[in-house]
From Swiss-Prot:
Residues given in the record as Mg(2+) 2 binding sites: 1361, 1442-1443
Compositional bias (Basic and acidic residues): 1151-1165
UniProt motif Bipartite nuclear localization signal: location: 1193-1227
Organism: Saccharomyces cerevisiae (strain ATCC 204508 / S288c)
Region of interest: RNA-binding: 295-397
Main location: cytoplasm
One example GO MF annotation: DNA binding
Protein name: Transposon Ty2-LR1 Gag-Pol polyprotein
Binding positions (Mg(2+) 3): 1625, 1667, 1700
Active site, renumbered: 457
Oligomer and partners: The capsid protein forms a homotrimer, from which the VLPs are assembled. The protease is a homodimer, whose active site consists of two apposed aspartic acid residues.
Gene that this sequence comes from: TY2B-LR1
Region annotation (Disordered) ranges: 1-86, 359-453, 1005-1038, 1058-1135, 1146-1165, 1170-1205
UniProt EC number: 3.4.23.-, 2.7.7.49, 2.7.7.7, 3.1.26.4
The record's account of how the chain is modified after translation: Initially, virus-like particles (VLPs) are composed of the structural unprocessed proteins Gag and Gag-Pol, and also contain the host initiator methionine tRNA (tRNA(i)-Met) which serves as a primer for minus-strand DNA synthesis, and a dimer of genomic Ty RNA. Processing of the polyproteins occurs within the particle and proceeds by an ordered pathway, called maturation.
Length: 1770
């Protein structure tokens, strides 16, 4: 493109600008970039040489090679005029593209108007608008080619030649940007732009104009091509393409940071200390330097630091050099303590000894002023404009300036003076040091002083005058002290102002101090700068910032002076000034010093202590007490800060102007724990500020949507009912109020959200007090009425109604009256919990009662009715049809409604009793409606209470019962919240079994038994319901004629499975009949189906048919426990497989068999019933919960339930029993913490770098870790883990791709020390790995299966290890890591090439790598469905990361695989396994002893012996050993845990550590502990004392049995098949919320290879359902193991499943496809049928006493636990 022409502006002048640049130089601070070439790094010096300017003489010149520069012009060409650039300074487009700045899609050059600079910046060539060096006129431009060779000979670049300015060289590479920017900043400073360049703090002295901005942008663009800029610069410019100043600011900051390390070393090497400053300050300074070096990975040892400090000690501290000279182990803390001791001794010695005032010749250039009241240091500053290049004005030697602004030599950075400044405290005086007036002395010849003039000092912070003649408004000094370099005070007599009257009538005033103790009067440029007055030393004038000359200044000697003629004299009396009470501060210590010395004690405490002589060597009169009472210590304000007390009534002034319902207070209460899901857990309250009217709304959660719905309702209610608009809502700062949703809601409606201030909860007192009042009322009402806790919100609702109607003590009206509502009609209110009878207008039958007992709660909000709670229906209804029971002595008191037992006929009669509610009686909706607070009470299910004995309190035998038992008043009970709505009906039969404790004790402390039998309904069922055949709601018809005969007869009853059992003939006088159950569960064995029988007392009844379809249409006769019930299999091979063949060789206990009909001792077979209601326990829920489970239409009686039939004529007397207030009972609820347990958090067993090496005090261990560290580094380099040929700048890489790295150290079990360099994959960005890739390892079941097959087939077992396995896998992604710490490259990054340990993708990469190698090079195939299990015709391999286990019949086959692996990987043989005697292995934590052809023992004795003592558990190694891990009957208390937060975290961490180790051991081989581990793991977040004690007991048992082993013996060679068996068991409802515990044990050829204990995911409603759930969990794993066994061993396989539930077996083999009880149960049952029939699975019955899976589902007595486990683990 055609080049642009430069227009000359004939009207613009440049003379003034030229004069300013050439003759006026700014006295500026030291340039942080002005570092000599000798101090530059190598690449800086190289770049300096390349871009240097050859020195010139008047006859020669040189111009650097630069395509932007043009040849210099002949001397005849005059300097160009300052005209505008063509097109306002626009660069030609081709030049812009050459610099690649078109990237910003902005104009290449900024348009700018005329910017005046020196004519030396303009060149005659009109084609180039940027400055270039102008050589002398007599020379010509050298050849650029020749210049290229001359650059290397130039030692350092020149910035100026004569009056010409050299532009910066062009940026040549990204790495040289830091060097280039130094020259560019210097170029701008020489271009009169130094005062707009930011310093290292980002500060500028003035704002630049647009022309200057354009000039900076254009020059930067011209000399810095865009493609050569660093990434961080590009990022700044991409945001704002013209923001060059930000780039310069960050550049300066980076250079300062890089130089900090050098400065710290210099400061440390030049430390000096003579006691002139406090020892504490000196220690802080040195420690700060050392800490800063440490942060830069430079560790300064104590020995080196002590040597540097000792070198700088002088005075009384010098002798410490000799003391520490011979010491080898010097501690820095000890040295500081010695220095502090000497410093304190010197203070005491100088207590009454005045120090000599030093001569002025000893003064250094340090001057500060410190007001006593604020203890604030005032250091001198230089505020005048930096627009001159000549040296600044000289400084007075007796008042020196801060060395921060002194010029430092470029070749040497001396920090000693800087360090000495910061080591001192300006206000600090040694004890005994006196301030006295010194005589004026002169450090210069008196002839140098210019009479009647003020010395202009650029370093003084204050103006000082010796005469008070010019001091205006003088006041005696009592605050300011002037301290010299030796910390000696210069007394100040007075403080005042100097008034100046300059030329042109300009007047100004500055602050001045009067003292006669100085050599001459000092005028501070800092004070002048505050008045916008600067000194121009080139023109020798004082000027305003706009250039107005105020007065000339005179140079005399080395100093500049201002005449005193410009001062306006004062008429103050000299006597007033000179008679200042100097004794006021002389010999007195400043109060701030004493305050600090006495530990920042209170003013009154210090003063009183001195009066009482509690502090010696110091008197009260020795301290300056002026302003002491008002002194504010900054450290005290920070350290002793307290919050202000709430100002009572502070909010009232903001609320007086509001009308009723315009200002609301709101707050949320909750949660309330242990409630049914249908009951609310929170409530939100509202209070009107003006009327104090209150509203409450129930909440189930605190979600944004729920809160928003309530606010919408309350605002609409107030608007419609009171015709008012809410303007302000006051609330706290909870997240439910501060969320964006609610904030937007308020904004859209113009409502002001008023939040409480931080830590001022009392400002929210209206809402807080309301909640407290409502809760107090709620607790009182519930306690008084005895209603269950789930009705708590009804109590709150009732309280709100009453509180709105009553007059508070502070008001003269009630809230209703203030709101304009009528008063409360007392006739519409009933006492909370008042017993009532609700009329039933539509019963199912005419003989059904017309009244239902209930309890009045509160008036209805939606009708004129009342909210009534009906315990029998577990519902609340809104009705007016009720009758109040007023006579407490009515005949109803003799009945107990809750303990009634209904027969099946009456159960059918009440089947539809919900339909009795007429139109005026609204059944409560299931949905939560904020307009109807009582709605939440719908479908409240109640939990059953423990039974109360209705019989005589005296001991009775089962056959002697009272005819008219004394019955107790019972309240409504609570049932499981998960039971369907049909279960809320009264149960047809209630269990009424007395409890007798058997005095015979067991090993666990006794067995609790009932003294009555557990009768079942006989097989005589009614046919009354024939009109609905097949209905599951069939009931037993018992009429009033079904009387009990006194005669006895033998009859038979049909069991659930079809087994007929005889009734045992007994004499009895009772009218109650008993029947036989098919199980007699122990207190913790409810899931078992024991074969013991119960005697039956026969009753003469009417036999009728049963229409209920039987599960087993043709059940077998009862067999003894030795026989099993086989499953009918479709496979022909079932003929050869019998129960005996399945049970053979299994490690089952040996039992003494009893006849199933033996009834010699009836009482021993009575089911055990616990008399105490309990919560969730380690052993599960108490049997009483099962026994009281109600029978409903959808829930049949379970096998282990005991029931008593009651004659029909007693029903009408007992059905009204529950009219007395019910008792509140504790529900069986799981603690909220159990729900939060997701998994066991692994405990860190490794050490960090600082723990293993830096701070490791064990030198031997440290040396081993150091050796391991270097070994790991060598391995990483050997594997080419990263690029070693290039380091990347940290700022140039996308942070997402940067992975943090660290070293971890650990000690292996064999004693070796291991170091591992790992990546922090836990904080790896998701974009840097493929989340679909999986890291696979061998399943533990697969390993156990392989070991079992190896034992049975005499396989050789070889153990291998591949060193640094992950590093063999390449990494595909672009990732960077920080280098190891020994390299010291903190700001550099390394490009990863290998899969470093810790990365998310490393495991998957290694798996794919080794899998490919094994398949392609070793001819292996991976077993389908079992990853990391590989096999060929001879060898099986189990792979666990870098560990390999090889199994083969031929050892040479293993060796062949090893040879192939060594070709590619560094493979170590841990154990070849070639010996024939016993071989010991350590495989994946298991300690294995293997004797081929004989046995295999698996244990962890060594590991547990080492790890368990380190858990901080109080082990009892010498005491009596525990014989079981837990005891049945121990229940975990569910009361809320109140604990400190720190203690809670500590205990949770302890639980994680203990359960983590126990879980590891349990799933490895201690399957007998899995139940206890699983139960305690659910309580990790509930670390109560009881839970911890149970955990300690488990750990103690592990310690006592640490030598136990899982014992395997070789299978008999006569066995042609592999036999795989799963034994299943379930414990019904023994977990929180009626969950069941299920367990399975898997055996291969009689060897236990795995076990599992877990809580059922679904809530089972019967024992059979729980057993089916357990079986359904076992079958899939059983099938997968079957496939694995067939792949590893080609023998035929027999699969068996054993369970102790006959009903489960019947359902599995049944072909009946009628509808099941619920879809979950039915789905599982149908699936089991398909899996059993389709997988040749044999299902057999196993006696409960032989079921070894029983240990997986419940705690057992010691005897039973041993019996079930001693065959397979001992």
């Amino acid at each position: 493109m055609e080049s642009q022409q430069l227009h000359q502006n004939p009207h613009s002048l440049h003379g003034s600008a030229y004069a300013s640049v050439t003759s006026k130089e700014v006295p500026s601070n030291q340039d942080p970039l002005a570092v000599s070439a000798s101090n530059l790094p190598e690449f800086d010096r190289d770049s300096t040489k390349v871009n240097s300017q050859q020195e010139t003489t008047p006859g020669t010149s040189a111009v650097p090679e630069n395509h932007h520069h043009v040849s210099p012009q002949p001397a005849s060409v005059p300097p160009p005029q300052n005209g505008q650039y063509q097109q306002h300074g626009m660069m030609t487009p081709n030049k812009a593209m050459a610099s690649n700045w078109a990237h910003y899609q902005q104009p290449s050059m900024m348009t700018c108007s005329h910017y005046q600079t020196s004519p030396a910046y303009y060149q005659p060539d009109p084609h180039y608008p940027l400055p270039q060096y102008i050589p002398p006129l007599s020379t010509s431009s050298p050849d650029p080619i020749d210049l290229k060779n001359q650059h290397s000979e130039i030692p350092q670049a020149k910035t100026k030649v004569g009056n010409n300015v050299l532009p910066p060289h062009t940026l040549t590479s990204e790495e040289n940007f830091s060097t280039w920017v130094k020259f560019y900043i210097r170029f701008l400073k020489n271009s009169n732009l130094g005062d707009i360049i930011p310093n290292d703090q980002g500060e500028i002295k003035r704002q630049m104009t647009y022309e200057e901005h354009a000039y900076i942008y254009n020059t930067f663009q011209a000399f810095a091509p865009f493609h050569l800029l660093p990434t961080w610069v590009k990022q700044i410019l991409e945001i704002n393409y013209a923001d060059i100043l930000t780039v310069l600011c960050k550049s300066v900051s980076k250079m300062q940071t890089n130089n900090q390390e050098l400065k710290d070393w210099i400061a440390l090497a030049n430390l000096e200390y003579d006691g002139s400053t406090s020892a504490d300050t000196f220690e802080i300074t040195v420690s700060t330097i050392i800490q800063r070096l440490k942060e830069n990975n430079i560790n300064v040892s104590d020995r080196l630091a002590c040597q540097l400090i000792l070198k700088g000690l002088s005075g009384d501290f010098k002798y410490l050099r000799n003391q520490y000279r011979t010491k080898t182990n010097m501690k820095l803390s000890q040295l500081f303590a010695e220095i502090q001791l000497i410093y304190d001794e010197n203070k005491i010695m100088n207590l009454n000894k005045p120090s000599q005032y030093k001569q002025h010749s000893e003064y250094k250039n340090v001057s500060r002023t410190s007001p006593n009241t604020t203890n604030t240091k005032v250091t001198t500053r230089n505020y005048h404009r930096t627009n001159s290049s000549k040296p600044r004005a000289a400084k007075a030697h007796n008042i020196a300036t801060s060395s921060k602004f002194s010029r430092v030599n470029n070749d040497h950075i001396n920090e000693s003076t800087v360090s000495s400044q910061y080591l001192s405290d300006d206000n600090e005086l040694s004890l005994g040091q006196q301030q006295k007036e010194s005589k004026p002395t002169h450090t210069i010849d008196s002839n140098d002083e210019l009479p009647d003039h003020l010395l202009i000092d650029s370093g003084a912070s204050q103006t000082l005058v010796r005469s008070a003649h010019y001091l205006h408004h003088a006041t005696p000094n009592s605050e300011i002290n002037i301290v010299d370099a030796q910390k000696q005070d210069i007394p100040i007599n007075a403080i005042g102002n100097l008034h100046f009257n300059f030329q042109n009538g300009t007047k100004t005033s500055i602050k001045a101090l009067h003292t006669p103790n100085i050599a001459y009067d000092l005028l501070s440029l800092s004070e002048l700068a505050n008045q916008n007055i600067t000194a121009c030393f080139t023109r020798n004038t004082l000027e305003r910032s706009d250039g107005t000359v105020l007065a000339p200044i005179v140079k005399h000697g080395d100093f500049y002076w201002l005449s005193k003629k410009y001062l306006i004299p004062s008429h103050i009396s000299k006597l007033t000034i000179n008679n200042v009470n100097k004794s006021k501060s002389v010999n007195k210590y400043p109060y701030p010093l004493i305050h600090r010395m006495l530990g920042h004690a209170n003013f009154r405490s210090i003063q009183k202590s001195l009066k009482k002589n509690a502090v010696t060597y110091l008197k009260e009169s020795d301290i300056e007490w002026s302003n002491a009472s008002t002194y504010q210590c900054p450290d005290c304000l920070i350290g002793k800060s307290t919050k202000h007390r709430h100002v009572k009534g502070s909010r009232l002034k903001y609320q007086e102007s509001y009308e009723p319902f315009q200002y609301l207070h709101t707050d949320i209460f909750g949660p309330v724990h242990h409630l049914p899901k249908s009951a609310p857990s929170y409530f939100i309250s509202f209070t009107d500020e003006k009327t104090r009217f209150q509203w409450v709304y129930p909440l189930h959660d605190r979600r944004e949507e729920s809160i928003l719905n309530v606010f919408t309702s309350i605002l609409a209610f107030i608007k419609n009912q009171f015709n008012a608009r809410v303007l302000v809502i006051q609330m706290d700062r909870g997240s439910e109020y501060t969320n964006k949703t609610l904030h937007k809601f308020f904004t859209n409606r113009g409502i002001t959200a008023c939040y409480t201030t931080t830590a001022d909860s009392r400002a929210h007192g209206v809402a807080e007090r309301l909640n407290r009042t409502l809760l107090n009322d709620c607790r009182t009402l519930l306690h008084c009425s005895g209603l269950p806790n789930h009705l708590w919100f009804s109590a709150v609702e009732f309280s709100t109604i009453i509180r709105n109607s009553l007059v508070s003590p502070k008001n003269d009206k009630s809230a209703r009256q203030h709101a304009g509502l009528a008063g409360l009609d007392i006739t519409t209110i009933l006492p909370f919990g008042q017993p009532v009878i609700v009329n039933n207008h539509n019963p199912d039958s005419k003989i059904h009662p017309r009244g239902i007992p209930g309890y009045a709660l509160h008036p209805s909000r939606n009708s004129y009715g009342y909210i009534i709670y009906l315990p029998s229906l577990k519902k609340t209804v809104d009705t007016t049809n009720y009758v109040i029971l007023q006579d407490n002595q009515s005949k109803l008191d003799q009945f107990n409604y809750d303990t009634l037992t209904f027969d099946d006929d009456l159960n059918r009669l009440t089947a539809h009793n919900q339909s009795f509610i007429e139109q005026n009686e609204t059944e409560q909706s299931y949905d939560q409606n904020t307009e109807s607070d009582h709605d939440y009470q719908s479908e409240i299910e109640i939990n059953s209470d423990p039974l109360v004995n209705d019989f005589s309190s005296q001991s009775m035998n089962p056959l002697q019962l009272d005819h008219e038992p004394v019955q107790k008043v019972r309240a409504p009970k609570e049932v499981d919240a998960d039971i369907s709505e049909y279960n809320i009906l009264p149960s047809p039969v209630r269990s009424r079994t007395p409890h007798i404790i058997n005095k015979e004790s067991t090993e666990m402390g006794g067995t609790i038994e009932s003294d009555t039998t557990s009768p079942r309904h006989s097989s005589t069922f009614t046919a009354r319901n024939q009109k609905r055949p097949g209905s599951p709601n069939d009931m037993i018809d018992l009429t009033s004629q079904d009387r009990v005969n006194y005669g006895l007869e033998n009859i038979k009853t049909t069991r659930l499975g079809g087994t007929e059992e005889p009734y045992i003939q007994r004499n009895s006088d009772t009218n109650i009949k008993y029947r036989t159950t098919n199980s007699t569960p122990s207190i913790d064995d409810r899931s078992s189906n024991s074969e013991s029988t119960t005697p039956i007392i026969s009753i003469e009844t009417k036999a009728v048919c049963d229409n209920t379809p039987s599960i087993d249409t043709d059940p077998p006769e009862y067999r003894s426990s030795d026989h099993a019930t086989p499953n009918i299999m479709p496979d022909k091979s079932s003929k050869n497989v019998t129960a005996d063949s399945i049970l053979d060789d299994l490690p089952l206990p040996d039992l003494t068999h009893k006849s199933p009909t033996d009834t010699s001792d009836v009482s021993k077979d009575i089911p055990h019933i616990h008399s105490r209601q309990t919560n969730s326990s380690l052993g599960g829920m108490d049997d009483s919960n099962v026994l009281t489970t109600t029978k409903s239409k959808k829930r049949s009686l379970e096998d282990n339930e005991t029931e008593i039939e009651v004659s029909r004529d007693t029903w009408n007397n007992k059905n009204m029993r529950s009219l007395e207030p019910p008792r509140s009972k504790k529900r069986i609820n799981l603690i909220a913490a159990i729900k939060g347990v997701k998994s066991i958090k692994p405990v860190r067993t490794t050490l960090r770098y600082d723990e293993a090496i830096t701070y490791n005090k064990d030198n031997k261990e440290k040396d081993r870790y150091v050796e391991a560290y270097h070994k790991e580094i060598s391995q990483l380099l050997k594997m080419n883990t990263w690029d070693t040929n290039k380091y990347y700048d940290r700022n140039d890489i996308d942070p997402k791709k940067v992975i943090n790295s660290m070293f971890i150290f650990n000690k292996k079990r064999d004693g070796t020390h291991k170091a591992r360099f790992v990546a922090r994959g836990d904080i790896q960005h998701p974009d840097t790995y493929d989340s679909d890739m999986q890291s696979n390892t061998v399943h533990h079941y697969a390993l156990m299966t392989s070991l079992s097959i190896a034992l049975d087939n005499d396989y050789y077992i070889t153990q291998l290890d591949i060193s640094s396995a992950y590093l063999y896998a390449d990494i595909k992604e672009e990732l960077y890591i920080r280098p190891p710490p020994h390299l010291g490259l903190n700001d550099k990054l390394l490009r990863l090439r290998k899969s470093l340990y810790g990365l998310k993708q490393s495991g998957a990469n290694w798996y794919e790598t080794i899998k490919s190698y094994l398949i392609n090079c070793c001819d292996m195939q991976e077993v389908r469905g079992w990853s990391c299990v590989f096999k060929n015709s001879q060898v099986t391999i189990c792979l666990f990361v870098d560990d390999m286990i090889l199994f083969s019949k031929d050892l040479n086959a293993n060796k062949k695989i090893i040879t192939t692996l060594k070709k590619q990987y560094d493979t170590k043989i841990i154990n070849l396994g070639e010996r024939d005697n016993e071989i010991q292995y350590d495989i994946l934590g298991l300690e294995i002893k293997y004797q081929r052809s004989k046995y295999m023992k698996l244990g962890m004795e060594k590991s547990l012996t080492e790890k368990l003592p380190k858990l901080n558990v109080p082990l009892n190694p010498k005491g009596k050993k525990l014989r079981a891990p837990g005891q049945p009957g121990h229940y975990i208390d569910q009361d809320e845990l109140e604990i400190d937060e720190d203690e809670y975290k500590e205990k949770v961490h302890e639980m994680q550590k203990l359960i983590g180790l126990a879980s590891y051991v349990g799933y490895k081989f201690r399957f007998d502990l899995l139940y206890y581990i699983n139960t305690l793991a659910q309580h990790i977040l509930f670390p109560s004392r009881q839970v911890l004690d149970m955990t300690y007991e488990l750990i103690q048992f592990m310690w006592d049995t640490r030598d136990k082993q899982l014992i395997w013996h070789k299978n008999k060679p006569t066995k042609p098949d592999n036999k795989l068996v799963a034994i299943s068991d379930a414990s019904y409802g023994n977990q929180p919320y009626y969950k069941s515990q299920i367990g399975n044990i898997f055996l291969l050829n009689g060897k236990v290879i795995g076990g599992k204990s877990t809580k059922a995911s679904l809530t089972c409603t019967s024992t059979t359902e729980a057993e089916i759930h357990a079986v359904s969990e076992a079958i899939p794993l059983l099938n997968n193991l079957s496939h694995l066994v067939q792949e590893l061993n080609k023998k035929p396989i027999i699969k068996g499943l054993l369970t102790d539930s006959r009903s489960t077996i019947s359902i599995i083999k049944s072909t009946n496809e009628e509808k099941f009880r619920n879809r979950f149960f039915g789905t599982k049952a149908m699936r089991l049928r398909d899996e059993v029939s389709g997988n040749n699975l044999y299902v057999y019955y196993i006696e409960t006493k032989k079921n070894i899976a029983d240990v997986m589902t419940k705690p057992l007595p010691i005897k039973t636990f041993k019996l079930l486990t001693n065959k397979w683990i001992h």
